[in-house]
């Protein structure tokens, strides 16, 4: 059933004798487009041929017209919604969409729980009560968790996340984002029992494998939901807020460990795990009450449900029925367009046609986050200790580091809208490269002096803060914006799995051995290795990462379909509907008119 029929309207079907009825409507829309061109300072010389102007393929527009009722009404309403969203002021977005902000932040709080849990596991290798319980004595007399077990536990978490991500792809397709998250919250409540009651590293490892499965579901669903419930002006705030949720969880974890650092009995490490039971029930209740993503509803042809979700996400005083109709039209139009230009909605389709380029971008940008040097920051407490800083001071530094990370993410919100995604990421990578070099030079003397150890520790704090000002939060925005809406969840899953796979290979195996005194014992010199990987991915970002700031999803579809080079994404003028040069307009008119006429013949 077409959307006009859903609203009780009679679709205007075009028969063979009615071409003159649709021609004026198309020409009227083209006139609107020409007027918009003149306002933007565009002329016919800026057509798609010279790379400054991208538009929908006329054949694609024609096929969309075949699949929907009352095509011209759909086009006009979608055009209104596209311009409204693209030109919306931030203050207006905050005024109209406070509910969308609230629901998105609520579901993203799953990541606070995950950040707390993963940080606890990462910090336990340097936490005295845990080391004394499960560790073996190192040559220097201290108890250490063997590198093989460090790798195994961290690797089990990543493997669990990979499994969970795949489960998320299947469940979200059938149940939607909300029920997939709720099922993971129920599961993780039971999985916490494993590490809490563990009396050996084997049971602890199994527990982290199972917890990782639930965490993998959260990683995808929260980002996808945030990207689909808010308009363009709010998109980077709510998607990058996911990174802040990680930091909040890590900050709470660091504070708990500082408070328990002097406790030597088994409750010194059991209390942090027991605190994980605080999160699931209230988050599950809130998730149950939240509206489903309207984009998910449109993709599954639940259009009435999608409209209800739209209205629940916006304040009624600023979101009229006309606004809802226009927003629905844009979602339906975008979905129909993606059906025509994409191969399908299976995982394999992420590697076909223009979606291959999009998959490359989301995977590599998440790999860049890992390979930028943040591995050292992620093992900060352990790194500080091996650099010569006391246990107590190392945990305090880690706590302060997480506080600065939060400040960095919040500060990025004020820059991101002006600087753009690519600029902020690129300069962040360059600054991190310099900080890594300084850190490495502090480890040339073995052992480093007190001043060198503290300098290296300071550089790691600045490194982590820089990451969380740039690539840390921005990567969540990029991976949610780049994929097509029909493949968003699967693309994020593939990207996060690439991230987890590289973590297993480099972070869980290489980084632990680099720092562990019983293994390679590089100390601060490990930063030289990460400086090398940083510069490789900095080059990729410069040449391959496009700028997506201020683009609607329909506009991004057109840019990728037109194969616009990454360096021209920001400057290319895009029209998602009927627009372009005079010849292109005529071609669109002819195709759509003939197809509409053919429907009734």
Where are the regions that the model predicts?
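Transmembrane-helix signature of 12-pass secondary carriers
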Residues: 2-311, 338-601
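Short intracellular "coupling" helices and adjacent cytoplasmic loop segments at the cytosolic face
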Residues: 313-326
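Cytosol/matrix-facing amphipathic helices and coiled-coil assembly/linker segments
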Residues: 324-337
């Amino acid at each position: 059933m077409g959307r006009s029929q859903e609203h009780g309207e009679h679709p205007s079907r075009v028969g063979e004798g009615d071409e003159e009825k649709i021609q004026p409507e198309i020409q009227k829309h083209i006139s609107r487009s020409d007027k918009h061109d003149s306002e933007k300072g565009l002329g016919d010389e800026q057509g798609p041929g010279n790379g400054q102007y991208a538009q929908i393929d006329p054949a694609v527009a024609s096929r969309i017209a075949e699949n929907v009722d009352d095509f011209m009404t759909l086009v006009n309403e979608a055009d209104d919604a596209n311009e409204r969203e693209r030109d919306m002021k931030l203050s207006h977005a905050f005024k109209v969409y406070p509910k969308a902000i609230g629901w998105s932040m609520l579901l993203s709080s799953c990541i606070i729980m995950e950040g707390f849990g993963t940080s606890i596991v990462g910090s336990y290798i340097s936490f005295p009560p845990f080391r004394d319980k499960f560790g073996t004595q190192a040559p220097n007399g201290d108890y250490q968790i063997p590198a093989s077990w460090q790798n195994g536990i961290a690797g089990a978490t990543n493997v669990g996340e990979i499994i969970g991500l795949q489960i998320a792809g299947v469940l979200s397709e059938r149940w939607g984002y909300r029920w997939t998250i709720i099922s993971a919250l129920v599961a993780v409540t039971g999985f916490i029992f494993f590490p809490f009651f563990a009396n050996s590293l084997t049971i602890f490892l199994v527990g982290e494998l199972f917890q990782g499965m639930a965490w993998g579901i959260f990683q995808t669903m929260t980002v996808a939901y945030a990207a689909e419930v808010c308009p363009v002006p709010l998109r980077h705030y709510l998607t990058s807020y996911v990174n802040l949720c990680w930091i909040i969880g890590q900050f709470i974890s660091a504070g708990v460990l500082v408070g328990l650092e002097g406790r030597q009995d088994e409750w010194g490490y059991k209390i942090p795990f027991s605190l994980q039971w605080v999160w699931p029930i209230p988050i599950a209740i809130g998730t149950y009450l939240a509206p489903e993503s309207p984009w998910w509803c449109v993709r599954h042809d639940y259009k009435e449900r999608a409209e209800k979700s739209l209205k629940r996400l916006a304040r009624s005083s600023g979101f009229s029925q006309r606004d809802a109709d226009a927003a629905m039209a844009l979602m339906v139009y975008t979905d129909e367009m993606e059906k025509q230009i994409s191969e399908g909605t299976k995982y394999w389709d992420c590697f076909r046609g223009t979606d291959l380029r999009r998959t490359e971008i989301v995977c590599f940008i998440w790999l860049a986050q890992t390979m930028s040097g943040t591995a050292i920051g992620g093992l900060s407490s352990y790194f500080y200790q091996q650099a010569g800083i006391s246990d107590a001071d190392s945990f305090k530094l880690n706590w302060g580091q997480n506080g600065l990370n939060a400040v960095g993410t919040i500060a990025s919100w004020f820059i991101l809208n002006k600087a753009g995604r690519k600029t902020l990421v690129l300069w962040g990578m360059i600054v991190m490269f310099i900080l890594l070099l300084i850190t490495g030079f502090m480890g040339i003397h073995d052992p480093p002096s007190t001043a060198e150890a503290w300098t290296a520790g300071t550089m790691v704090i600045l490194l982590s803060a820089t990451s969380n000002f740039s690539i840390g939060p921005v990567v969540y925005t990029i991976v949610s914006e780049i994929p097509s809406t029909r493949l968003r969840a699967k693309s994020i899953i593939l990207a996060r799995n690439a991230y987890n796979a590289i973590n297993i290979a480099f972070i869980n195996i290489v980084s632990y051995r680099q720092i562990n005194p019983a293994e390679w014992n590089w100390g601060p010199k490990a930063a030289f290795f990460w400086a090398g990987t940083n510069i490789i991915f900095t080059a990729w970002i410069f040449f391959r990462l496009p700028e997506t700031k201020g683009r609607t999803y329909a506009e991004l579809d057109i840019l990728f379909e037109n194969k616009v080079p990454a360096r021209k994404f920001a400057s290319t003028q895009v029209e998602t509907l009927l627009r372009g040069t005079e010849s292109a307009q005529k071609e669109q008119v002819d195709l759509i008119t003939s197809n509409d006429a053919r429907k009734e013949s």
